[in-house]
Each structure stands twice: as structure tokens, then as C-alpha cells.
From Swiss-Prot:
UniProt keyword terms in alphabetical order: Glycogen biosynthesis, Glycosyltransferase, Transferase
Signal peptide: none
Pfam families for this protein: Glyco_transf_5, Glycos_transf_1
Coiled coil region boundaries: none
Biological process terms in GO annotation: glycogen biosynthetic process
Organism of provenance: Clostridium beijerinckii (strain ATCC 51743 / NCIMB 8052) (Clostridium acetobutylicum)
Designated name of the protein: Glycogen synthase
Pathway note: Glycan biosynthesis; glycogen biosynthesis
EC number: 2.4.1.21
Family assignment from sequence similarity: Belongs to the glycosyltransferase 1 family. Bacterial/plant glycogen synthase subfamily.
Residues that bind ADP-alpha-D-glucose: 15
């Protein structure tokens, strides 16, 4: 099975969000199942030094972007059992940020075409191309309407398109079709790419891929409704026969409390008592009251309304009247940043607001906290709750998307469950479930049972990778 995994980012090369984690971990897990999987990403200015020195120049060629020919260099390296191709064009990708430029339409039009041209240049024929999010949405369109029509080399290639977050759709002026792709306006006029008065790259991927996947079963259902579908729900209902939900995993080598180099004391399910050492150490580091018995609640997240920040803001004063500690790590909307800074100054040794992104501190928080808050408005899959489970920190989540699929509400009578959940997007429900969790926390026997349930949850990529591999085989007709 030969698979080309196409993404705009992949850990450890470059990562801005969950897509980077998936593109780093899923191919690795597929390779461990003997798939010939290769990954292709752009060569950004900020590619990690960890892998930059491994890159080897392969060749260069020109890529047609509208009426122009643009340089494309191919670099290659082998990492974690996977071959990575990194496509180089300094005019498009040697910039201080990854996304958010006026010419993003052109940048990823170049990338999508360059990926297909590269396959011919290196003479490698994948059975299947797996595209991800809007940045690669035009690749299935190019494959169907140009490359398969003009070159038998591409004839048998199938396309899978994965939605990681449907809120980002890549909508641009329709004139890009003739100017960047050389298409006439038929694809716009027949509405397959049309979104309002623009062209949506994501809609192209949805309409012209062979199979659509998304990152959890519940999210696959949700995005077919007007509430969550971001006005693409109609397309998804039409193609529901081709839509699959496959829950993401996490890399158990990267997130492992037994080997984590960032935390004070490594521990496992057989030494849960050592988790408290990480808690007191973090309390010292952040200037909180040092007491292993005070319940510590934490969030490692973007500070945006999608992540349920307004719910926490509404109850924060009331919550902090309790004997609890609150630790926040992340950046986002200014008014949320300012609110948590204010809480930090007002409540001193009960609150630590860390308005930054720090991987090392994130791991310390996962290892130290007792409860991990994810009251999201919507959450395609969510990685935070999976990491928290791995570290024995109990998630408190809203029942949406992947949170609903991965967190089973604790039942104090049967001892089953790995977290706490609430249904409606409501501050009172969040407060009430936190109060219930704090009540269970007082019973050390029940709490230790809950920690064991959490750490025994299987959220590795091994399980999800097998589901993807079965899907690939079904699609390509291979055993």
C-alpha cells in the first residue's frame, strides 16, 4: 500500500495546530503497519532545526501557476520510519508566519499542483493521496479535471480528503480559477466550488475526493447539521455515503509520563502517587500555594470562544471562592487574555495565567493538574483531553465532537468512566459538573480509580491507523 499524505504542516517540521500533530503521528503509525507512506509539506522558513539538518536536496522543476512558471525544489529526509518531501519556493514560503497572507490562494494553488508534478518528477506512484484541510482542497480537483485526463500515470490514484476544522474553508475570488489553475468558470457556475461569491478550496476537496474523513464519529454527524456545518452541511449531507468519522489518537512515544523529559518526576499507572510530586513542583514554579491536596484545575488551549472561554469567565469568580487552584496556558483573544491576567493579580496564589505557548510548561501542567477543562463550543476531535488521560489528569468536557467520543462520564456507583461531561453550552452546567468533580475528588479511593481508568484508556494512533489502513485498502481494492 503506497500512500502520499499531503498537508500544509507536520510535526516535528512545523506545527501551528492539531493538523501538525496528526500529520506527524498518523504516517508514523501507518509505517509501523508496513504501509509505504510518504508525507509532503511546504518548506517554510521556520522549519524545526531538529529535522532541517537531515534534509537532502533531490531535484528541482518548474510548476505552472496560471501563465507563469514557478521554481520548485524537492528536499527529502527519512524520519520516524517515514519519507518526508519538503517543497521549496522561497517567494511563497520563506516568511515569518505559516498562514494569513494576502496571496494564500496562490501559495497553496502552487503547492497543490507542485505535489502532483513532483510524483511524475520522482517517478513514484502512490495508490492513494490523502489530503488535509482547505490548503490541499484543490488537489483532488486538479487530479480529476487535468492530471487524470492528460496522463495515464495518475489514472489509478484515489483521493481521501480529511476535515480537521470545517470553520477554515479557504474562500477566494472566483477569478483564481482561470488565473491560477487555468480552468474556465464552469466549475464555479455549476456550484461545486462556489461558496457565496467566492471559490472554496475546502468545497473542492469535499466534492471531488473519493472518500471524506473527519476526526471523530460525533463530528462527522455534527457537520451535517446547520449548527456545526458552517454552511457546508448541505454538501456533506449529499455526500454522507462517502463520509467517515475516525477519531484521532496521540503519539504515545511523545506523550508518556514514564519518559517525559520536561516533568520533575516520571511516573506510570503503577506509581500514581509520584504524580503529586509534579503537582507540588509546579505550584512552586508558578507561585501557587504548595499543597498537594488542593485540587488543581487547568487549561492548555487557545483562548477563544470556540474553546468555551466565555463559560469559564462567567463562573471564574464564583469558582475561585472554593479551595481550588486554576492554571491557564495559552494565547488568543485579547479580552480573554486580559481577564485571566486580572484573575492572576486578584487571586495571587490561587491562579496562574501564562499567556504564551510553551511545550515544556504544557507537559508539566498535564502531569501536575488534577482536572483538565475543555468546555468547548465545538471540538472536531481535541488532543488536550487525550493527553490529559495519558497523564492521569481527569478531563471535564462538554459533550461535543471528539470530546463526546473519547470521554465517558464517571459513574460513582459502578466505578466506570474516565472523566466528567456536561451537555448544554451553559455556564451553570459547567460549574455544576466541576462541583461534582470536586466532591468525587474528596474520596481518594474513587479518585484513584478514576485516574486508573483514565490512564488505561487506549487513545494511541495504533488503533486509528488500522481503521485508516482498512479504509485505504477498501478504496483501492487491495487486501
Amino acid at each position: 500500500m503506497r500512500v502520499l499524505f499531503v498537508a500544509s504542516e507536520a510535526s516535528p517540521f512545523i506545527k501551528t495546530g492539531g493538523l501538525g500533530d496528526v500529520a506527524g503521528a498518523l504516517p508514523k503509525a501507518l509505517a509501523q503497519k508496513n504501509a509505504d507512506v510518504r508525507v509532503v509539506i511546504p518548506k517554510y522558513k521556520e522549519i524545526s532545526w531538529e529535522v532541517r539538518d537531515k534534509l537532502r536536496f533531490v531535484k528541482w522543476f518548474n510548476v505552472k501557476v496560471g501563465w507563469r512558471e514557478q521554481f520548485c525544489g524537492v528536499w527529502e529526509c527519512f524520519h520516524n520510519g517515514v519519507t518526508y518531501y519538503v517543497l521549496d519556493n522561497e517567494a511563497y514560503f520563506k516568511r515569518d508566519e505559516v498562514y494569513g497572507f494576502y496571496d494564500d490562494a496562490e501559495r497553496f494553488a502552487f503547492f497543490d499542483r507542485a505535489v502532483l508534478d513532483m510524483l511524475r518528477q520522482i517517478d513514484w506512484q502512490p495508490d492513494l493521496i490523502h489530503c488535509n484541510d482547505w490548503q490541499t482542497g484543490m488537489l483532488p480537483v486538479l487530479l480529476k479535471f487535468e492530471y487524470k485526463r492528460n496522463d495515464m500515470f495518475y489514472w489509478k490514484m484515489k483521493c481521501v480528503y480529511s476535515i480537521h476544522n470545517i470553520a477554515f474553508q479557504g474562500v477566494f475570488d472566483p477569478q483564481i480559477l482561470p488565473e491560477l489553475f487555468g480552468f474556465d468558470m464552469e466549475l464555479y457556475n455549476n456550484t461545486c466550488l462556489k461558496f457565496d461569491d467566492g471559490v472554496s478550496y475546502m468545497k473542492g476537496g469535499l466534492c471531488y475526493s473519493d472518500v471524506i474523513t473527519t476526526v471523530s464519529n460525533t463530528y462527522a454527524y455534527e457537520i451535517q447539521t446547520p449548527e456545526y456545518g458552517q454552511r457546508l452541511d448541505g454538501v456533506l449531507r449529499e455526500r454522507s455515503y462517502a463520509l467517515r468519522g475516525i477519531t484521532n489518537g496521540i503519539d504515545y512515544d511523545e506523550f508518556n509520563p514514564k519518559t517525559d523529559k520536561f516533568i520533575k518526576k516520571n511516573y506510570s499507572i503503577n506509581s500514581i502517587e509520584d504524580k503529586a510530586i509534579n503537582k507540588t513542583e509546579l505550584q512552586k514554579e508558578l507561585g501557587l500555594t504548595v499543597d498537594k491536596n488542593i485540587p488543581m484545575l487547568a487549561m492548555v488551549t487557545r483562548l477563544t470562544s470556540q474553546k468555551g472561554m466565555d463559560l469559564l469567565v462567567n463562573i471564574s469568580d464564583k469558582l475561585l471562592q472554593e479551595n481550588v487552584q486554576l492554571v491557564i496556558l495559552g494565547t488568543g483573544d485579547k479580552h480573554y487574555e486580559e481577564h485571566f491576567k486580572w484573575l492572576d493579580s486578584r487571586y495571587g496564589n490561587k491562579v496562574s495565567a501564562n499567556i504564551k505557548f510553551d511545550n515544556g510548561l504544557a507537559n508539566k501542567i498535564y502531569a501536575a493538574c488534577d482536572m483538565f477543562l475543555m468546555p468547548s463550543l465545538f471540538e472536531p476531535c481535541g488532543l488536550g483531553q487525550l493527553i490529559a488521560l495519558r497523564y492521569g489528569s481527569i478531563p471535564i468536557v462538554r459533550e461535543t465532537g471528539g470530546l463526546k467520543d473519547t470521554i465517558t462520564a464517571y459513574n460513582e456507583y459502578t466505578g466506570e468512566g474516565n472523566g466528567f461531561s456536561f451537555r448544554n453550552y451553559n455556564s451553570d452546567e459547567l460549574y455544576n459538573i466541576i462541583e461534582y468533580a470536586l466532591w468525587i475528588y474528596k474520596d481518594k479511593g474513587k479518585w484513584e480509580n478514576l485516574i486508573e481508568n483514565a490512564m488505561n484508556s487506549d487513545n494511541s494512533w495504533n488503533r486509528s491507523a488500522q481503521i485508516y489502513l482498512d479504509l485505504y485498502r477498501e478504496l483501492t481494492g487491495q487486501d
